[in-house]
Each structure stands twice: as C-alpha cells, then as structure tokens.
Amino acid sequence: LFRSGISSLIPSTWKVEEGFDYHCSLIDVADVLGIHADIIPSDVPYIRIPENLVGYWKRQLGQILPPAKHRIGLVWQGNPDHQADMFRSFPLDSLEPLCELDDVQLVSLQFGRGSEQVQRWKGSKPIYTLPQDIDRSSGAFMDTAAILHHLDWIVTSDTSLAHLAGALARPTVLMLGFTPDWRWLLDRDDTPWYPTMRLVRQKRIGEWRSVAEEATAFLASKLGESQ
C-alpha cells in the first residue's frame, strides 16, 4: 500500500553501500531540509487503493452492514505494548456519546486486541463488526484502506489507523491524550500533516468521556452540514 506513494522502497534489512549521495537519520530529515510546521507538505491523498479492492469492499459492506445514512468507523485501542499506550488508548465505553448522533451507523475497525470490548458495549446504538481476517490475504492495511473509502467519518485513538486515514484524506476525528506525541503539536485542533483531520484534546489525564462529547458535537455539526 505505502509503495504507491513513493518512487522506491529499500527495506532496512538491505545493506546499501553505494548508489546514494547522502545519508541522514530519519528523525533529522525535516531539520536538514528546513521544513517547519507552516510548510509541511499536505497534498493528500498520497497513497492509492486499487480500484478493484475498493469495489470489492463496497459489495462486501453492502452484504455485511444494513443500509445507513452515515457510517462512522471506530478505533480505540492501539498497540498495548507501546510505552505510552495508557495515555493514548481509551475504553470503547468512552465513545458512548456518539450514540446521540442521528442516522449514523457505528462500525468497529478494531482488529485483534481491544476488539473483545465490543462484546461488553452498552451503548444505545449497536456497533457492527467486520471479519477479523481483514488484511491477511491482501497485505497489511490494504483491506482496511479500501474499507475507509466507504465510511463517512473515522473516530480514532492515536494509532496507525489515524495516519492511514489522514494519508487517504478521509474525514477523521483524532482523540488525543493530555500529553500527545510531538507530531500533533499543542493548542490547535488541526494538523499540518493531514488537512482532513480534526484533533480533539484531552483536558485531564485519564478522562476520555469529555473528549468523546466534544468529538460528538463536532460530528453533529459536520453531519448536519451534509443533510
């Protein structure tokens, strides 16, 4: 999937001793190139999904999910082994305010760890689940990327799917912890990386419901605009 947005990809396991002019640590690239927040390239989408896969998932979702006016994809759990996971992932129950939205269908994009929380969901709207073998045959993120194409909005924690949605220019609400990763900066609700993304920030460590309430209010206004 990510090869569609670059001219070439060299795996880190390859030993490359010639054929390049410069070498630079990835974390230093922005500084070396003189890139700052105001000039970060944000021409999205910069990765492409095969049309046949997009069409396949349009048909599949039509069979798996009932008709809906608006579909909202949900992700709440990142990698539990991440050193900051306790500050960026949140319980699924925190998203209960989303049930206040009219004419929406909630769809879980949570696969593997964290997906078991759907069984304990007590919200007034059901959460529809997708097959757990997604991406296993088509390649990492391929099916997921095609599915995002058929959702109106994505609500997600700070995990890999947030970056996938942003790179695909999908409308996204990112729920951030009190002290987020450096790339999300501070004191702003947008991001120079992904122009279709809205940032909703936690005001107090560990308190996620108010973040979901703010996300819900934002979505209500955007969905109202599309009526």
Predicted segments with their positions:
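Catalytic machinery of carbohydrate-active enzymes
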Residues: F2-Q227
